[in-house]
A protein has these predicted regions:
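Terminal, low-structured helical/coil segments at or just beyond the last alpha-helical repeat
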Residues: 66-80
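TPR/TPR-like (Sel1-like) alpha-helical repeat modules
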Residues: 29-31, 43-63
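Alpha-solenoid helical repeat scaffolds
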Residues: 35-36, 70
Length: 80
């Protein structure tokens, strides 16, 4: 895991740059990157793909957060 890159992905997502954030998340396969990837597909509205990535996290679920901003802030907090 590259914590700096993943933090950058979260910041980009928070700033609304879905594509740039997604490109970073795709480059990593650890549970934090998978969680970011899941949230990005939740933002996109692709429920099936989002749940696919949630299944590859350390226990996070699609239903755990209704507010994606709050979820991204939680990921950011964990990465610090």
């Amino acid at each position: 895991m590259n914590k700096d890159a993943l933090m950058n992905a979260v910041n980009l997502a928070l700033d609304g740059d879905w594509d740039a954030s997604h490109k970073i998340a795709q480059d990593y396969s650890d549970t934090s990157a998978n969680w970011i990837h899941a949230v990005l597909h939740k933002i996109e509205g692709d429920v099936w793909n989002s749940k696919y990535w949630y299944a590859r996290t350390a226990g996070s679920r699609y239903e755990d957060f209704t507010d994606v901003r709050e979820e991204l802030l939680e990921i950011q907090r964990i990465l610090k």
